[in-house]
């Protein structure tokens, strides 16, 4: 059973949570920190416990970074395919952590991997979400040259999610990198066009344009802040909200 946590009514019925692969590293320099997996599983379980349907996309940067190898001469398509496989590995690890917490979960891959994951099917994904399972979308869009941010926005639109929640290391979008610039100011709210015009680097151009064209709200928040994810889902004002003006 998913953990029962709050009597507050959720603001969102269905969300798409985007985690970076680097987030799974925790304090490690590479790979997956089991403690981080367990903490994330607990926070996701809190959402399931109040009836929120959760779709999940995880990057692969903790296991493989194709851009560096591409710059060194590796074929870009080959590198992107390797990156897709890294996201599948992260998805399997997250499914295991969720199931150990008695939270039902399903991994779907945009690349067919019979016997390892289910192949991505929109209608099947929505049936499992309606049944209370966490659905983990892996292997990006299945196409090279598309980021996992683009995959997250695409899947959110396909499954008719209410919002995309992008978990980062900082509590929102700033005028500059707050780790490098102490005078950086945080935005409470932005429009898609402001993100594009200011070149804020929240997500890649394709992802932002997808959200803008389909009017999909996007909230950027700090996943390392305890309770932030639950607070957003019940209507709290964590991070930065990006939506149509």
UniProtKB/Swiss-Prot annotation:
Molecular function GO terms recorded: ATP binding; UMP kinase activity
EC numbers: 2.7.4.22
Keywords: ATP-binding, Cytoplasm, Kinase, Nucleotide-binding, Pyrimidine biosynthesis, Transferase
Protein residues bound to ATP: 18-21, 61, 65, 168, 174, 177
Pathway recorded for this protein: Pyrimidine metabolism; CTP biosynthesis via de novo pathway; UDP from UMP (UMPK route): step 1/1
Any single GO BP term: UDP biosynthetic process
Binding-site residues for UMP, renumbered to this chain: 60, 80, 141-148
Compartment(s) where it occurs, according to its Swiss-Prot or TrEMBL record: Cytoplasm
Reaction catalysed by this enzyme: UMP + ATP = UDP + ADP
Any one GO CC term of the record: cytosol
UniProt keyword ATP-binding present: yes
InterPro entries named among the record's database cross-references: AceGlu_kinase-like_sf, Asp/Glu/Uridylate_kinase, Uridylate_kinase, Uridylate_kinase_bac
Activity regulation, per record: Inhibited by UTP.
Major subcellular site: cytoplasm
Top-rank EC class of the record's enzyme: transferase
Role played: Catalyzes the reversible phosphorylation of UMP to UDP.
HAMAP family: PyrH_B
Family to which the UniProt record says this protein belongs: Belongs to the UMP kinase family.
Record note on quaternary structure: Homohexamer.
Protein name, as recorded: Uridylate kinase
Lineage of producing organism: Bacteria, Pseudomonadati, Pseudomonadota, Gammaproteobacteria, Pseudomonadales
